[in-house]
Amino acid sequence: MKLTCVVIVAVLLLTACQLLTADDSRGTQKHRALRSDTKLSMSTRCKGKGAPCRKTMYDCCSGSCGRRGKCG
């Protein structure tokens, strides 16, 4: 019984720590999943329309690199 209570308290403490850490780090990851162009442009420096780009770098503010290697 005592061991069960200790385990429950430990799980609750770890859960609380996870929730606090997740709340503090919200919006600070640079390339999490590239969910939106707005988040990408706010977290990194992006290139404007017509600037040279690479499709693998995701560095255009618009989020799209054209066929000719220029931001769209």
Curated annotation (Swiss-Prot):
<keyword id="KW-0732">Signal</keyword>
<dbReference type="Pfam" id="PF02950">
    <property type="entry name" value="Conotoxin"/>
</dbReference>
<keyword id="KW-0528">Neurotoxin</keyword>
<comment type="similarity">
    <text>Belongs to the conotoxin O1 superfamily.</text>
</comment>
<feature type="signal peptide">
    <location>
        <begin position="1"/>
        <end position="22"/>
    </location>
</feature>
<feature type="disulfide bond">
    <location>
        <begin position="60"/>
        <end position="71"/>
    </location>
</feature>
<protein>
    <recommendedName>
        <fullName>Omega-conotoxin-like S6.6</fullName>
    </recommendedName>
</protein>
<feature type="disulfide bond">
    <location>
        <begin position="53"/>
        <end position="65"/>
    </location>
</feature>
<dbReference type="GO" id="GO:0090729">
    <property type="term" value="F:toxin activity"/>
</dbReference>
<keyword id="KW-0027">Amidation</keyword>
<feature type="disulfide bond">
    <location>
        <begin position="46"/>
        <end position="61"/>
    </location>
</feature>
<comment type="function">
    <text>Omega-conotoxins act at presynaptic membranes, they bind and block voltage-gated calcium channels (Cav). This toxin blocks N-, P- and Q-type calcium channels.</text>
</comment>
<keyword id="KW-0108">Calcium channel impairing toxin</keyword>
<keyword id="KW-1015">Disulfide bond</keyword>
<feature type="propeptide">
    <location>
        <begin position="23"/>
        <end position="45"/>
    </location>
</feature>
<keyword id="KW-0872">Ion channel impairing toxin</keyword>
<keyword id="KW-0960">Knottin</keyword>
<keyword id="KW-1218">Voltage-gated calcium channel impairing toxin</keyword>
<keyword id="KW-0638">Presynaptic neurotoxin</keyword>
<dbReference type="GO" id="GO:0044231">
    <property type="term" value="C:host cell presynaptic membrane"/>
</dbReference>
<feature type="modified residue" description="Cysteine amide">
    <location>
        <position position="71"/>
    </location>
</feature>
<dbReference type="GO" id="GO:0008200">
    <property type="term" value="F:ion channel inhibitor activity"/>
</dbReference>
<dbReference type="GO" id="GO:0005576">
    <property type="term" value="C:extracellular region"/>
</dbReference>
<dbReference type="InterPro" id="IPR012321">
    <property type="entry name" value="Conotoxin_omega-typ_CS"/>
</dbReference>
<dbReference type="GO" id="GO:0005246">
    <property type="term" value="F:calcium channel regulator activity"/>
</dbReference>
<keyword id="KW-0964">Secreted</keyword>
<keyword id="KW-0800">Toxin</keyword>
<dbReference type="InterPro" id="IPR004214">
    <property type="entry name" value="Conotoxin"/>
</dbReference>
